[in-house]
């Protein structure tokens, strides 16, 4: 995933093979931002994600949080990149996360329709002050009314696994969405543009509209060539 987003050739220690996406088009830039106490070698993409994979012991462990954010056609690419970097630094890195982000502008892949966006991959484990990886979860033991640990049928203390950070919570995700919306709209206002975005759904905005479905590059290419698709027809019906 990291190689694809960055358009690079990376070697996986776990799989013992290279992932080569150096021929992938549309990758404008990619960066890794670190919190102050993170080892500087994590600025190397292969080192970072191989280390993340090595620290996990369970073969099905989730390695990273990953999400995409749309950039704005009303802004220049330089402005979009600066805005993306500011968001990643302020909302993610300043909270202790290592963040790997890449800006894409795959015009040709999307049938000529500008679709700038950026991908973000962040670490799930916090980094301790000494630069080592912290725990994803901690044990919170179940206590009785007298403060003693409750035992299960096998005589072992019962506990709940509690996340050590709030990074994966719905509330945090909402904060990120709201922060991005605010940053973009502030930029629009500063440039004197009469346009705004809203991170809320139509339902939350009180708007009686049906959202369009995501078409993707293949559908957009077909539509650009005059080939009508089911998703294209549905979106035309929604917009009518």
Task: Please name every model-derived segment.
Residues 1-240:
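N-terminal nicking endonuclease/strand-transfer module with a His-rich metal-binding environment
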């Amino acid at each position: 995933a990291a190689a694809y987003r960055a358009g690079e050739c990376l070697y996986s220690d776990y799989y013992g093979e290279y992932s080569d996406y150096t021929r992938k088009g549309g990758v404008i830039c990619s960066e890794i931002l670190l919190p102050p106490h993170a080892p500087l070698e994590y600025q190397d993409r292969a080192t970072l994600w191989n280390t993340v994979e090595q620290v996990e012991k369970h073969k099905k462990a989730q390695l990273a949080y990953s999400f995409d954010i749309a950039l704005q056609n009303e802004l220049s690419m330089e402005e979009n990149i600066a805005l993306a970097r500011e968001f990643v630094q302020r909302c993610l890195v300043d909270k202790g996360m290592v963040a790997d982000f890449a800006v894409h502008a795959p015009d040709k892949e999307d049938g000529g329709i500008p679709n700038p966006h950026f991908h973000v991959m962040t670490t799930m484990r916090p980094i301790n002050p000494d630069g080592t990886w912290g725990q994803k979860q901690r044990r919170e033991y179940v206590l009785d009314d007298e403060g003693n640990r409750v035992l299960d049928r096998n005589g072992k203390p019962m506990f709940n696994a509690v996340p050590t950070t709030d990074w994966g919570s719905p509330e945090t995700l909402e904060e990120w969405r709201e922060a991005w919306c605010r940053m973009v709209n502030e930029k629009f206002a500063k440039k004197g543009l009469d346009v705004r975005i809203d991170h809320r759904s139509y339902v939350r905005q009180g708007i009686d509209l049906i959202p369009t479905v995501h078409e993707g590059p293949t559908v957009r290419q077909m539509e650009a060539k005059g080939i009508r698709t089911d998703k294209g027809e549905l979106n035309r019906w929604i917009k009518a």
